[in-house]
Structures are given as C-alpha cells and as structure tokens.
Amino acid sequence: MVHSQLPVAAPLRLLCALLLLPLATMIPGGLSPRSVTDPDVQEAAEFAVQEYNALSANAYYYKQLRIVEAQSQVVTGAKYYLTMELMKTKCAKTTGKPKVYKEIQNCELPPKAQQEKLTCRFQVWSCPWLQKIELTKMSCN
C-alpha cells in the first residue's frame, strides 16, 4: 500500500512546488521601477542634488539635468535608487548660507564648450512618518 501512494505523492509535491514558484520570486523588499515624474522620486532627487552640492568639494554648484532611471525598495520607509545627470553651473559656492534646490536649478550653465556633465547614482532613504530623509550612497563619474 505504501508503494501505491508514493507515485501520487511525488507528482503532487512537484505540482505544489511549481505553483508556489512565482510567489517565491516576488521577494518583499525587492526593487521596483518608478516613474521619473513620480512626486516621491522628485523629492528624493531634489534631496540628492542638495546633498551632492553640500558634500562636493567643487567650487561651483551642480544642478539636475534629468533623472535617467528611478527604482524604489520598500524598507522601513522607502529607499530610492536614482541615476541622474547633473551639470556644473556658473553659481559659485560662497561662505554663508548654501543655496537650496530651487535656487540651484535657476543657476545659469556655462557655454557649451565649458560644460561639465556628471552621471550620478544616488540611494536616498526616506521615512515620512519619522520625518527623516538621508543620502545613503552616492557615486558620480
């Protein structure tokens, strides 16, 4: 009697495993593509530009040209993975109060021959209910 149940049990287990396979590939906390026009993505991008300028040793501000790609990950809050193009402006960093994002975006660009464009990858963590936002990773080239 045991032998007659084995052939049925094995295919049944295989069928169950195959049915559960799509669920196993949808891992909580995985990366999801986001629209570059999404308001949350825009907010994370603005923060990344401000932080880049605050941390950069460059004497001039860089402004956002465009968001190339955006992804997010659900963590405690949300983590945004952004690929962005930044351009060096004519606005010099001076001592005193640093410029905010909107002021930086209004800075003029140098003539085409003198323009310096960067492609940057930023990771921004946002937790709105704690009113926290942090730049967790940055690399530009």
UniProtKB/Swiss-Prot annotation:
Annotated SMART domains: CY
Location of the motif Secondary area of contact: 73-77
Expression across tissues: Expressed at a low level by the venom gland (at protein level).
Cellular location(s): Secreted
Sorted UniProt keywords: Disulfide bond, Protease inhibitor, Secreted, Signal, Thiol protease inhibitor
Occurrences of domain Cystatin (ranges): 29-129
GO cellular component, one term: extracellular exosome
Disulfide bonds: C91-C107, C120-C140
Signal peptide: 1-26
InterPro entries (alphabetical): Cystatin_dom (IPR000010), Cystatin_sf (IPR046350)
Superkingdom of origin: Eukaryota
UniProt cross-references to Gene3D superfamilies, sorted A to Z: 3.10.450.10
Family: Belongs to the cystatin family.
UniProt-recorded name of the protein: AsCystatin
Organism, scientific name: Austrelaps superbus
